[in-house]
């Protein structure tokens, strides 16, 4: 069993990661305070209450974007750096920029003209994204936030889940995040029992830890022992993927990713973010 080198990860982050992820590591693994994480997140905030400035490294526009809001709220939550002012502003921005059907788009048109990954293109009509909407709604429900945007997003997600057929792996990850924390637990369990097998029926998950390319693993869908989708995988499969994750630490101390590295800066920022994520997953599963 590979034992991750936490000190090596710390050195990698010190030499390669942005302040945000260095502060995340400090908070989560070195007993650091929550306030520096809050302040690091706030540095990406705009006057409209949303978040931008490449907080999500693949969209390098200064304008507020839903994916950046999702990352901001998730970071505040994980570090227990929850800030009512930042959260209220983000929710107000979401409400002011919601698609007609509710929720949040994946990419807003304000990305136009700025460096971005090839998949960061605003769709015509600004449809709601299961991925961003599910992530944001999940975090807000976990924190028991009440806001009109969340009410509309929850209704939208339930409608989409009731007719779920082929959401794609990212969309399904958003659905699972939502089902993890939405207050109506009975409905969430029923929805999961109906739709959980789509993970296999639509070939969204790679069960082989050595699968190559931009694949999604069981740990992407069920990173923690209490994840709603963990029951879909046997213990041997989870342990094999944990072994693979632990063994994925590079010689420089960091972890990397399996999608297109379209920008050296974005790649470095993603590696910093995902290094902290990898350590979190390994610790949650008893590997640290």
Tell what function each PLM region has:
Residues 1-288:
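Preference for long, amphipathic alpha-helical scaffolds in soluble/luminal domains
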